[in-house]
């Protein structure tokens, strides 16, 4: 373990890798990151699978076994195999942490982002297909996704809620989570191993807000560049602490073994070269947090990160940042609404590419 990744972990942050591929599993790379860089979980998304499945070679043997199946079936077989194999690698960590960590996430078809019924249906299908207790099903935090989150948790299925950008939506996600756990309890499920994280996206907020600040051009605007995303995430953590401390339903559920839905910082790779490549890790360290990071960010953290606690005592400053943005005419809700819509659209585009790449693979191995 490196000093920085160990310190980050010791201060309450579970380090998950935001990447997965057949070659990463078969090469031993994933096991190496577990052994040497404190990695205790994995997240995937359509863009990650697009990158993985575009590789010619690693998936050919399985494609040959599948034969001339339809492309949707092939994609699900390939992706769930990777996730299943990864969950097996993490099983020891899952058991050692009482299934808090050792989790591997797989996302529902992004084309269902605004379809509650079919999102909930596919969540069950994916859970049963992977068939591992340390898997997590990713569901987007669209308005239509919220009831699907509750319905999925109510069946005892672990959920990673993704594409959260705003405090307003995050509060709705926490409410959907608590309601889902309450229903799971009423349905007779053991609450101890139902896991959930709320994936709150970080760096994309700075990318969007900084453009507006640059367009403003004032000294006040310049002083706020690179501050919106961390302030927004820190206020999400404030909300996390407040909601779980004050919601009367949660105390009863926790007494029955339910585990808190941890905030997960996503989109933590630095997009602006002027900022530290550890910015969205080092500035967001506290207890009961997950940070999922691309390997480049993980390597930066391991090499020169800090990992010291960095959220406590920052709420007043963070509220001030958001207020100053509003004074400059920047409505953060407008920004985050667009980021959610853009995020769904980007994942759909990636999924379409996945389907095209796998169809090419099917045609190639069956030629």
Question: For each of these PLM feature ranges, what is it?
Answer:
Residues 18-22, 47, 107-113, 140-144, ...:
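Active-site beta-loop-alpha junctions enriched in small/polar residues
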Residues 12-16, 40-43, 101-105, 134-138, ...:
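Structural preference for beta-strand elements that scaffold enzyme active sites
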Residues 48-148:
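Active-site beta->alpha loop and helix N-cap motifs at the rims of alpha/beta catalytic domains
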Residues 1-30:
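N- or domain-start disorder-to-order transition segments that initiate the globular core
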Residues 258-363:
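Flexible, acidic glycine-rich loops studded with aromatic residues
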Residues 157-296:
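Catalytic alpha/beta core domains of metabolic enzymes, predominantly
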Residues 45, 106, 137, 152, ...:
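Conserved, mostly hydrophobic/aromatic
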Residues 24, 115-121, 139-153, 166-180:
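Active-site-adjacent beta->alpha loops and helix N-cap segments on the catalytic face
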């Amino acid at each position: 373990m490196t000093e920085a990744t160990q310190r980050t972990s010791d201060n309450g942050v579970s380090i998950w890798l935001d990447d997965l591929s057949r070659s990463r599993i078969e090469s031993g790379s994933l096991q190496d990151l577990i052994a040497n860089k404190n990695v205790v979980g994995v997240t995937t998304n359509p863009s990650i699978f697009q990158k993985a499945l575009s590789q010619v070679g690693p998936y050919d043997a399985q494609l040959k076994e599948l034969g001339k199946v339809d492309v949707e079936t092939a994609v699900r077989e390939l992706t769930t195999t990777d996730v299943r194999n990864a969950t097996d690698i993490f099983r020891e960590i899952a058991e050692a942490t009482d299934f808090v960590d050792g989790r591997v996430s797989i996302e529902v078809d992004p084309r269902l982002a605004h379809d509650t019924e079919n999102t909930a249906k596919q969540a069950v299908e994916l859970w049963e297909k992977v068939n591992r207790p340390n898997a997590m099903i990713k569901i987007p935090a669209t308005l239509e996704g919220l009831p699907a989150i509750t319905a999925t948790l109510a069946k005892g299925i672990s959920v990673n809620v993704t594409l959260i950008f705003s405090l307003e939506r995050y509060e709705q996600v926490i409410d959907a989570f608590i309601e889902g756990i309450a229903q799971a309890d009423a349905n007779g499920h053991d609450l101890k191993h139902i896991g959930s994280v709320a994936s709150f996206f970080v760096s994309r907020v700075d990318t969007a807000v900084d453009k507006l600040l640059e367009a403003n051009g004032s000294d006040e605007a310049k002083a706020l560049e690179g501050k919106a995303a961390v302030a927004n995430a820190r206020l999400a953590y404030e909300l996390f602490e407040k909601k779980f401390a004050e919601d009367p339903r949660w105390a009863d559920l926790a007494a029955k073994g339910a585990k808190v839905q941890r905030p997960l910082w996503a989109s933590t790779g630095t997009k602006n070269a002027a900022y530290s490549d550890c910015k969205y890790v080092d500035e967001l360290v506290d207890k009961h947090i997950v940070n999922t990071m691309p390997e480049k960010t993980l390597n930066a953290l391991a090499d020169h990160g800090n990992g010291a606690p960095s959220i406590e005592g920052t709420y007043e400053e963070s509220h001030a940042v958001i207020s100053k943005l509003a004074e400059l005419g920047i409505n953060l809700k407008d920004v985050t609404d667009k980021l959610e819509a853009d995020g769904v659209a980007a994942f759909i585009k990636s999924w379409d590419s996945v389907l095209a790449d796998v169809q090419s693979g099917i045609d190639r191995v069956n030629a």
